[in-house]
Amino acid sequence: MEITDNIITKSKNIKLKEEKGKIMRKKSIWIAISLIVVLGLLIGTVGCPSPTPTTTAPTTTAAAEVTILYHCPWPPGIILSNNEINWMDKVEERTGGRVKFERIFGGTLSNLENQAVSIKDGVFDCGQTSYVYNPGLYPLGTVTTLPTIEDDTAVWAHATHEMIETTPELQAEFAALNQHYLFTWALEPMEMYSFVKVQTLEDFQGLKIRVHGGAALAAAKLGWIGVSVPWEEIAVASANHVIDAACVPCPITGRDAGLHTIYPYYVTPFPIYQFHFATVMNINKWNSIPADLQAIITECSAEAVDDALAYLDRELEKGYQDLRDAGVEWIDWPAAEMDKFRAQAGEPCWVDWVVQMNEQGLPGQKILDRFLELCAKYKASSD
């Protein structure tokens, strides 16, 4: 037993010495490493100058900049593009250049009829759409383009803008197309250019008349021959006498298209209906814009309604003079004929519209009543 115990004791002593040896070796290694590090620091301190102390400024994020791809189906320099150009210029200026529009004109990416879907699909971010060219996409919105719904363009523009801004059903039509509504801008009322000296409703019978929107509804009621001609083709169709008369906004928009050099007669005052344009933005693009910039864009959009009306006022007399210079003859549309038009093709079309909306499960009467209420509101404030 003593021999065994001695062997065990010696074995333990040997292991203990081995452990101590390992510990000593580890300490030696760490000491060596520490000396090397200290030596390196000393050399660096002697060999390199000390950096100049600096004060660290608070961390700031650069102001966000947004580029919006805008597309217009028309060339620049005419009413169909200038209203949006004026709005974009104002947005860029008021945001201090933080919002910039990349501008494409001339229908490179879409014609007017396809603008709504192109914006929906994100082909471009922003541009104009129209209830008249896309009635199936904005059925309730077409209340604003019914014949004789409102003769006063300023009243109509403000009522239409507020209608869209405050009516969930109309907002839903834009939302369904991935669009954020910005503003409505007005043209002159839709009147008539003609190759024939018309002075009564009966004089239009048998004529091929370019119509759309509210004018198409009225033509159907009156038994006129309505012809669909897109704006891009109207000058050629007129010059070639494919049509005998054209329901268009005459003194500015029609002048810009050169129609005053083609038609000999301008029938006025004959406000058949008001054409609708809205400027909208793809909702995903809108949601990507910082809130402070959204607020400025919204502010400029609200002002754009009046800016467009001011543009009309500035250009109207120039347009009239251009018509005179081209030798266009004014036909003074009799008030009695206008009254007949309202009775036969105005309110009867409103009734039909309500029925059509109801058949689609839409609140036609509610929307009609609301729009008439807003027109009355703005008419009263303008008196």
What residue ranges belong to the model's regions?
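Short, low-complexity disordered leader/linker segments with a strong preference
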Residues: 1-67, 380-383
